Every structure is written in C-alpha cells, then in structure tokens.
Amino acid sequence: MHPLQVCDPGGSQWCIDLSSDALIEIDHVTFGYDSSRTILNDLNLRFMRGQVTSVLGNSGCGKTTLLRLIGGVHAANKGRVVFDGEVIDVHNREQLYRLRRRLGMLFQFGALFTDLSVYDNVAFPLREMTDLPEPLIHDIVLMKLNAVGLRGAAQLKIAEVSGGMARRIALARAIALDPELIMYDEPFAGLDLISMGVAAKLIRTLNDVTGATSLVISHDVPECMAISDWVVLMATGGRIVAQGTPAELMASTDPEVRQFVRGEPDGPVKFHYPAATIEEDLGVAR
C-alpha cells in the first residue's frame, strides 16, 4: 500500500489516494435503476479541486445519474463515490446532511418555489440549514443576488422573471451556503444566446472567485469548451469515450469524439435506437 493511501480495513480491494487533489472520485461505479438496464458500468472518474469540469454526452448516457450518485440520492450497485476522501453512504443521514451542506446544485429547470419571492428563494437554504440571524441572512442574500446581477429583482415573484433570470436566481440559491462543489445540470438548456453567454460567464467567474469546484453536465459543446479546465465525453452505458483539456478534445481525430464535438449527424453514434428492421416490424420482410 502506498503511504498516502487509505484502504478498506475489511480486506476488500478499494483504496483512496490521499495524495490526490481530486475533490470527487468515482471508483469502479456500476449503477442501474433496475436489473434490466445498466446506466453506468465500472465508471472511474476524478473531479479535480478548483477546476471547472464538464461532462458531455448524448441523452441517456448517465450524466444526470452521475450527479445523483454524488449527491447521495442513489447508492451505487458496485463501487464507491468519494467526496473529499470520505466514502458517501446513502444510509448515513448525518453524513449526507453534513456533506450536502458543502455542495450546491443548479437543477435543469431551476426548481424555484413559485409562491416565494426571488429574495425568499435565495434565503431558503440559509434559513433551513443554518442558525444565522435574519439581518445577516439579508446581507448574504443581497450579495448572492448581486453576484448574478439580480439584486434589483429581489422582491419580484418568480412568475415575473424570464427563464434566463430564473436560472440565475437558482444559481444564487445554489451558492448561498458557499459550497465547495457546485453541480450544474444542463445550465444552458432553453436559454437564448445572450442568456447562455451570461450563464457560462457566471459559472467560470464564480468558480474562480470562490475557489469552488464546478461540475457541469451539458450537451452544449461551445459553451463548455470555452469555460472548462477539463472535459469528459460519455457515451451510452456510462462509457468514457475521451477526456482531456478542451483543446485536446477539439483536436482529437477519434471518429466518435469528432462526431460529438462537431455535431455531425453521421458517424459511430447512430440516430436509430437498436431495433429490428422496419420491414420486420411492418411484416413485409422477405
């Protein structure tokens, strides 16, 4: 055993490398929602501290499932998810509560409370998870809204804001507790070009200013390539096609990588879901 490794005292074959600068480690993780379909198969990934890492891939390849495993929503069928050297145990509620205070989540559709004001949406985690006095919460909320350019919208209702503004409000809420890890699930979905540019700039700026680690799940190649330190390309079944810097992936000659980053319709990734021939399904096969 390496002197900077901690291994399972029970004698199984896993070890955690304490010399690693990874905040999150996905260690031989296999997961499926039922026994008939495996979403992630023996997945190994490391998300480095202080970096923006984007995970790109086609729909259904397991990107959002990966976030759920990191957040302790689901337990891996095999393998381990490690957060800052600590193996996540979904059955340990005290641990989950403690670890979740250290992460922020921007959901794909915002998940804002429509009956609350912008201010109260951002204040919600501070009121629920801390004992801070209301005057201090007031100042924190205004600072977080100012960081996303919406301090002036604090008293608006959610029904009064645009989709792009709602995404920024959700981001302000996600960073309310100053998380070490910020996870973004499709942060650019449904945004116009200007709002998309604003969202991308915010992700990069907040990461650099706060020193957080950011994990971005997305289909949007140009935005992710512009803001990421590291990019992971996944395929169906949780298979890692490639990973590297944005420049390395853009220069790749691998046909599957080229097809995805260039949005080419023809290539190794097929349009049709596996099926019998159309002639067989229509009963006209010869």
Q: What are the language-model segments listed below?
A:
Residues 71:
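Helix-to-loop junction immediately C-terminal to a conserved catalytic motif
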Residues 56-58:
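The feature captures the beta-strand-to-loop junction immediately N-terminal to the Walker
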Residues 182-185:
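Catalytic Walker B motif of ABC-type/P-loop ATPase nucleotide-binding domains
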Residues 178:
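Conserved catalytic motifs of ABC-family nucleotide-binding domains
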Residues 88-104, 134, 249-252:
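ABC ATPase NBD coupling module
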Residues 157-161, 165:
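Conserved ABC ATPase signature
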Residues 87, 134-153:
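Conserved ABC ATPase "signature" region
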